[in-house]
């Protein structure tokens, strides 16, 4: 892209991170895997202070990254959707999981994150990173629920000792 094209580029609305995945398990089982920290720790974060409950702050921890955040469920509609607020990259954002039965005991899970703030470059990075993170989470969920396999996708995304910037230099 030339500098002229770059200079004329602008966002017309704040972007939203969005991804989805078909999981070959019934809605109740897929929903439970997101709501219940004892299951979610098998494919996403490594520790949690408890099960999601509306209005109750919960701490999620990714020990491999020395990161923990507080999330608060804003809505839980059993087997339909979970909405949480969490710190986001530049301020609080809203994450929503929706669960739709597809037939034959399968579920389509959709995840969105909205409410990002920042300039255009920051917004594009935040949305790309968030979309990637939730895609890895859903792939890990799929592998765990369908096959009983822990892929460790979230943990392996940023392994210690690997500098991505060094890998992309020519």
Region locations from a protein language model:
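Hydrophobic pocket/interface hotspot
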Residues: 30-34, 40, 58, 73, ...
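Intrinsic-disorder/low-complexity, polar/charged segments enriched in Ser/Thr/Lys/Arg/Asp/Glu/Gln
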Residues: 16-20, 57, 68, 81, ...
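Hydrophobic/aromatic beta-strand elements that line small-molecule binding cavities or substrate pockets
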Residues: 21, 70-75, 94-101
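Beta-strand/loop substructures that line and gate deep hydrophobic ligand-binding cavities in soluble
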Residues: 89-136
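Hydrophobic ligand-binding cavity/cleft-lining segments
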Residues: 1-49, 168-170
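Short, highly charged C-terminal tails/helix-capping segments
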Residues: 143-170
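Glycine-rich portal/gate segments that line the openings of hydrophobic small-molecule binding cavities
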Residues: 41-42, 47-88, 170
